[in-house]
Regions:
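Residues in the recognition helix of alpha-helical DNA-binding motifs
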Residues: 17, 31, 42, 71
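Flexible coil/turn residues that form the inter-helical turn or adjacent wing/linker of helix-turn-helix
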Residues: 10, 21, 35, 50
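A short, Lys/Arg-rich alpha-helix, primarily the initiator
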Residues: 1-20
């Protein structure tokens, strides 16, 4: 059976924050304007949190939005490369890092 948890880093983070604040999934689903089953899948890493939800989460939990966005993007990179062989994953990440460093905004 294929593992459907591809957005796990961000999902774990939002679950940990929710539990630390003693909130229920229902409350978060309402805040993010989604239903509870979808929110549950986000925490499990089976569904991706939408980008527009990140500022709401940062405000609710009083955390740095940039840090949440970084984690969210890292999950996207991981999801894109997850099915590739390990050496190819690492080479692709290294090449992308080089490209970002060399990019002059053109």
């Amino acid at each position: 059976m294929k593992d459907k948890r591809i957005y796990g880093m961000f999902g774990h983070k939002i679950k940990d924050m929710r539990l630390e604040h003693g909130l229920r999934q229902r409350h978060l689903a309402e805040l993010l304007e989604t239903d509870m089953p979808m929110y549950s899948k986000m925490e499990l890493g089976a569904r991706r949190v939408r980008r527009d939800m990140i500022p709401k989460l940062a405000e609710l939990y009083k955390v740095n939005e940039h840090e949440l966005m970084t984690l969210w993007l890292a999950d996207a990179v991981f999801a894109a490369l997850k099915s590739e062989e390990k050496s190819l994953q690492l080479d692709a990440v290294d090449l992308a890092k080089e490209h970002f460093k060399a990019d002059k905004g053109l």
